[in-house]
């Protein structure tokens, strides 16, 4: 798409991308709604910055030695969060008060041996990480690119002030971004840049967005480098877009929307500024609009989203970036969702996000600051709640009826951030989780390794799916492109599919037909199979189940009535101790196991 548009205008006159008014434009900065909030946050950040979190070698090696990512990343991200807050406060106040701690943090980041994370320290996709970084050959990963964009924004906003206060620091800053980000991006090929038919993921647009920010702000007067950056970015984005269906569904789940579709939005905005008139028509492409609106279709109510793969049910709060994306593609529903979320958000600047990796992108903060007034003034006249939708590219059906919202996943087990969850169903009633997808634990060395499916949350037996028992064996789903649902048929208010292929070769199993339908009365789940032995169906819930014969009560929220070849029911409490899971769930979840043969129908309402 983009490379074709660029081929028609190869000699375009480069434009300039301006992320926000310069700090000297006091009329623009002094009237921002966030003015006082950022001055207060800057004071706290200045106190915290008296002790910059250290990044010693033993923390870097923690990933290699123990598989733990969190300890190094906590300190790494804390440095960048402090820098962002101090820069925003200095831009608001424009007094020089925050320049000394800003300089200390810039210097500390420039002194780091590597900007990539230990978990990303490799040059070949899906290969084991190297124990130590090679300082002569930087790796451009997600957060190296984030760091480059952050320092480029510091240069744009405060470069002159920093150089006046600390002569030579500005040269060091720009030199490190050039050496660690721009030259490698221009001269080497990292897997996320795209290579023909090779599958891409959110890394592609996320890294590309940040490399474009760094190029645009460090080399605004270099037509040669701007043109080369535009061409490189256009190719990468095309490689990313090829993996999306026309329906715009994100196979990585709603939580990755902000890292995939929203970074696509920003990358396209920058490209449109750098290459005036070349890419403007992309905003009218149905695929791009569908990608924008995906998050609105996945929204349940309040903070909850339909989730699968590595996605949490708490997939983030919508805000200014979503609003601007919706505005660009003409989506009133997306603008309305973003405006409502932003208005209700007690932390619109993202200062207290539980995810360490959030709050480190200075451009996002500028977007929020300068977009806040428009978002708060928006009135959602004509905005309607999204209806049912079928995403054939991923095999996802979203249905709404009365008090209920259901997500029914067909597809297969080769998604990016895959879990073995083909055929699973999630269900909400009155905006509360009823049948749940647990999500993913804190990332570790095992998460993205050949041992991934040893992690319990990845396994089909911890999703709302069957397992098959026979001859002393228990059969669960397998991971890989060949393990899919077949004969998938979208129905009014539901979906029908055969799940047998997702399990591979199970003796005696050739068909497991699941039909799920949602009405105002609730969800009807009908499973029929030719498997001759016992089937054990998992039902995961947040509400404690109470079994009364063929009735299961899920707290006071709902009840399930079972009929068919029922053999028995068992319930168990599942202790939740992982920090990432505890962000979404209480300390105990529940698994109900329904044992049956032949046919089972469950009416949940």
Please describe what each predicted stretch is.
Residues 261-262, 266-434, 595:
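Carbohydrate-active enzyme catalytic cores, enriched for enzymes
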């Amino acid at each position: 798409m983009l490379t074709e548009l660029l081929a028609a205008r190869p000699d375009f006159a480069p434009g300039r991308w301006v992320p926000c008014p310069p700090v000297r434009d006091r009329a623009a900065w002094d009237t921002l709604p966030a003015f006082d909030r950022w001055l207060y946050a800057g004071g706290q950040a200045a106190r915290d910055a008296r002790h910059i979190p250290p990044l010693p070698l033993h923390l870097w090696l923690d990933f290699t030695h123990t598989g733990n990512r969190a300890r190094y990343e906590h300190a790494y991200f804390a440095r960048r969060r402090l820098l962002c807050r101090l820069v925003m406060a200095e831009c608001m106040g424009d007094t020089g008060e925050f320049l000394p701690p800003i300089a200390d943090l810039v210097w500390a980041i420039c002194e780091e041996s590597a900007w990539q994370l230990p978990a990303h320290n490799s040059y070949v996709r899906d290969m084991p990480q190297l124990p130590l970084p090679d300082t002569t050959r930087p790796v451009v990963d997600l957060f190296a690119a984030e760091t480059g964009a952050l320092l480029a924004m510091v240069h744009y906003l405060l470069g002159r002030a920093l150089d006046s206060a600390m002569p030579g620091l500005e040269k060091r800053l720009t030199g490190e971004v050039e050496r660690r980000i721009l030259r490698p991006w221009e001269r080497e090929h990292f897997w996320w840049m795209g290579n023909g038919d090779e599958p891409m993921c959110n890394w592609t647009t996320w890294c590309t967005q940040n490399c474009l920010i760094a190029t645009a702000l460090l080399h605004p007067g270099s037509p040669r480098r701007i043109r080369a950056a535009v061409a490189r970015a256009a190719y990468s984005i095309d490689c990313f877009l090829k993996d999306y269906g026309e329906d715009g569904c994100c196979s990585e789940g709603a939580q990755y929307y902000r890292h995939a579709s929203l970074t696509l939005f920003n990358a396209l905005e920058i490209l449109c500024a750098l290459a005036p008139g070349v890419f403007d028509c992309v905003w009218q492409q149905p695929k791009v609009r569908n990608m924008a609106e995906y998050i609105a279709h996945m929204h349940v109510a309040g903070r909850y989203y339909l989730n699968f793969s590595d996605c949490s049910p708490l997939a983030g709060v919508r805000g200014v970036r979503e609003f601007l994306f919706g505005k660009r593609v003409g989506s009133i529903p997306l603008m309305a969702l973003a405006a409502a979320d932003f208005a209700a958000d007690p932390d619109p600047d993202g200062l207290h996000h539980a995810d360490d990796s959030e709050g480190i992108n200075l451009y996002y903060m500028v977007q929020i600051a300068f977009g806040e007034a428009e978002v708060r003034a928006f009135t959602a006249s004509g905005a309607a709640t999204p209806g049912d939708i079928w995403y054939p590219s991923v095999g996802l059906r979203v249905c709404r009826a009365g008090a209920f919202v259901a997500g029914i996943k067909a597809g297969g087990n080769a998604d990016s951030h895959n879990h073995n969850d083909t055929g699973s169903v999630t269900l909400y009633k009155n905006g509360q989780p009823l049948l749940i997808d647990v999500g993913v634990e804190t990332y570790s060395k095992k998460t993205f390794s050949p041992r991934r499916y040893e992690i319990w949350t990845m396994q089909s037996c911890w999703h709302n799916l069957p397992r098959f028992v026979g001859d002393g064996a228990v059969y669960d789903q397998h991971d890989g492109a060949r393990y899919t649902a077949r004969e998938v048929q979208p129905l009014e208010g539901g979906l029908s599919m055969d799940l047998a292929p997702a399990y591979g070769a199970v003796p005696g199993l050739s068909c497991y037909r699941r039909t799920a339908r949602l009405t105002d009365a609730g969800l009807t789940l009908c499973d029929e199979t030719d498997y001759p032995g016992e089937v054990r169906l998992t039902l995961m819930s947040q509400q404690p189940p109470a079994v009364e014969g063929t009735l299961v009560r899920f707290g006071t929220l709902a009840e399930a009535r079972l009929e068919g070849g029922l053999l028995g029911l068992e319930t168990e409490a599942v202790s939740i101790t992982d920090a990432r899971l505890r962000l979404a769930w209480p300390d105990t979840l529940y698994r109900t196991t329904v044992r049956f043969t032949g046919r089972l129908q469950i009416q949940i309402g």
